[in-house]
Design a protein with these regions (language model features):
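Active-site/acyl-donor-binding loops of N-acyltransferases
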Residues: 2-6, 122, 127-146, 208, ...
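Active-site rim helix/loop that mediates acceptor-substrate recognition in acyltransferases
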Residues: 7-10, 24-70, 172-192, 196
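A short beta-loop-alpha structural element at the N-terminal edge
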Residues: 16-29, 154-166
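Conserved beta-strand in the GNAT
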Residues: 57, 63-72, 78-85, 194, ...
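Conserved acetyl-CoA-binding loop-helix of GNAT-fold acetyltransferases
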Residues: 86, 92-105, 126, 223-236, ...
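Conserved GNAT acetyl-CoA-binding A-motif
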Residues: 105-118, 239-249, 269
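Amide-forming acyltransferase catalytic core, primarily the GNAT-like/NAT-type
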Residues: 129-215, 225
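Glycine/small-residue-rich hydrophobic helix-like segments
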Residues: 201-257
Length: 295
């Protein structure tokens, strides 16, 4: 489908909506939608996402925002889709599919990935996306007290600027696509830990401000033991603060580790793909997402 084949206007309930590309001055519109659908994004979080992707807004005749959708190109043949929001009063009336079709047309030829809420799952399924994995959102106020013993073959140290090239390579192996622009933006606003083997980085975890507090991610590690060793120092530094992690890992021991720290089960989303499966079959895996929108 060509983008020019999709109408720039559509009737949504009593409104005639017009779609236009997202512009630099649309922060207020996009953040307004986040608040309307009860997403935790602060204005700073939306600003970061807008700097990394492109997308569309649907607005009515008096410039009220009705829906949004974004995509984030990573390398030459892959993209993440996210920030798909529709004003609560207009959900199920077709605005989401209308914008999704525009994004799919823009991304023709790319393998695509997204993380679907329960409410949006059927929309993406109808567009040809297939489920890949469940992502567990864990969050809470970090408790004071001992964590379960963490045993890893690699020592862990604080992330240094000189690590960044090696961390990009690790992330590409785990994620399945090159996303230098995303990582560089995250490095600029994050702290982190690095697992070291034979003097070289073997895994890493980042933490940054997001939503109600801070989010841990991405976390890239060889195994669960390395992932917990990377995360543990970040938890200890943030006792009494709100943290979140979004993870594929569903092992009882990993959940027990997070439970002990106060990061309780909150919600799940479904990772879905259109095109070939990427990542997950190399020496390192993603144990924590950078964000639902960025993977």
């Amino acid at each position: 489908m060509n983008p020019t084949d999709i109408s720039t206007t559509q009737r949504v309930d009593a409104f005639v909506a017009a779609a236009r590309p997202l512009e630099s001055g649309d922060l207020h519109h996009l953040h307004q939608l986040c608040v309307g659908v009860s997403w935790p994004h602060r204005a700073r979080d939306v600003t970061l996402l807008m700097s990394l992707g492109r997308g569309y807004l649907a607005l009515d005749e008096i410039e009220r925002v009705l829906a949004s959708g974004m995509y984030f190109e990573m390398g030459e043949d892959f993209a993440m889709i996210g920030m798909m929001m529709t004003a609560p009063r207009l959900q199920t009336l077709g605005a989401g599919r209308w914008l999704l079709d525009r994004i799919l047309a823009d991304c023709g030829g790319r393998d695509l990935r997204l993380n679907a809420t329960r409410a949006a799952y059927r929309l993406y399924e109808s567009a040809g996306f297939v489920p890949v994995a469940t992502i567990h959102q864990r969050q809470g106020i970090v408790r004071e007290g001992p964590l379960p013993e963490v045993v890893s073959a690699c020592p862990v140290r604080t992330l240094q600027a000189s690590d960044q090239a090696a961390l990009r390579a690790l992330d590409q192996m785990a994620f399945g696509a090159e996303r230098r622009a995303v990582l560089d933006a995250l490095f600029a606003v994050s702290e982190g830990t690095v697992a070291v083997r034979d003097g070289a980085p073997a895994g890493f975890a980042l933490i940054r401000d997001f939503g109600r507090g801070r989010v841990i991610g991405p976390v890239v590690a060889e195994d669960e033991a390395m992932a917990t060793a990377l995360i543990a120092p970040l938890l200890r530094r943030h006792v009494g603060q709100f943290l979140r992690i979004d993870t594929f890992c569903d092992s009882p021991t990993f959940f027990a580790f997070l439970d002990a720290a106060g990061l309780d089960a909150f919600d799940t989303v479904t990772q879905m793909r259109l095109g070939k499966q990427r990542g997950g079959d190399g020496p390192v895996r993603t144990f924590g997402l950078a964000a639902h929108t960025l993977g």
